[in-house]
A protein has these predicted regions:
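The feature marks the mature, well-folded catalytic cores of soluble enzymes
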Residues: 12-15, 88
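A glycine-/small-polar-enriched, mobile loop at the entrance of the PLP active site in fold-type I
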Residues: 14-71, 75
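Single conserved hydrophobic/aromatic residue that forms the stacking wall/gate
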Residues: 1-9
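Conserved PLP-enzyme active-site core in the AAT-like
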Residues: 19, 23, 28, 52, ...
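A generic structural signal for short, non-catalytic loop/turn and secondary-structure boundary residues
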Residues: 10-12, 62, 206
Length: 228
């Protein structure tokens, strides 16, 4: 609030943020953000720093896939992935056992795709054998969406079993690991994940506003071969 010509700023240093995100930002990170910056598009050094940071994220996620950092909260990566992968009429399998799992259907529909819901109890992780039985009956999907950790419930799905199973049926994967990566092990290459999305405001313990996306060569090819 404003008092006269002076702004009164409440001291929040005594508070501890215990929400699942945005999380408490460490003091050294907060201080680093207070340093002077340049215009990224005019600073040649920024491109080297950006590339190095992307490579470090790839290393942490155990992948040779390209990593990009986007300016926006984690949900930006989820929509960007669906927007880039979906063409009108594409059937997309939505693995739904949580709020964010179900939310993928909206993104797919927005870009003309046909979301096919595979819905399970929100209190239980996906059973890989049950999913396999389902896929034996219907696996005609361009890609599938899966949430690693669904933030509201804390539901943790085993992406290291789910994604390889989907790949065995020729189905690419878009994986939401916004609240999973760096808090739980993620080995992108071992799990054969095509697109993995994360965010800065969860286990990275940074402020909100950045999205991390890793993209496989197969996913890039699908994007390049779009007809629309």
């Amino acid at each position: 609030r404003l008092v006269g010509s002076e702004m009164c700023i409440r001291d929040r240093s005594k508070y501890k943020i215990m929400t699942p995100g945005p999380v408490q930002v460490p003091e050294n990170v907060r201080l680093a953000r207070s340093l002077s910056t340049t215009n990224a598009d005019l600073d040649p050094q920024f491109f080297d720093e950006y590339k190095e940071t992307c490579e470090l994220i790839s290393e942490l996620l155990h992948t040779k896939n390209e990593t990009l950092i986007l300016s926006g909260e984690g949900i930006l990566g989820l929509e960007a992935a669906c927007a880039s992968m979906t063409e009108p009429g594409d059937r997309v399998l939505i693995l739904d056992n949580g709020i964010y799992g179900a939310g993928f259907a909206d993104f797919v529909s927005m870009y003309g795709g046909i979301p096919v819901m595979y819905t399970k109890d929100y209190k239980n992780a996906f059973d890989v054998d049950e999913l396999d039985a389902y896929l034996k009956e219907d696996h005609d999907f361009k890609y599938a969406t899966v949430v690693h950790c669904d933030t509201p419930s804390g539901m943790l799905n085993d992406i290291h079993k789910i994604c390889p199973l989907l790949k065995s049926y020729g189905i690419m994967t878009v994986t939401d690991s916004v609240s999973g990566m760096f808090g739980n092990e993620v080995n992108v290459d071992k799990a054969q994940i095509d697109i993995l999305c994360g965010g800065s405001q969860k286990a990275v313990s940074a402020p909100p506003g950045l999205t991390f996306v890793t993209i496989s060569d197969e996913a890039k090819k699908a994007m390049e071969n779009r007809k629309t």
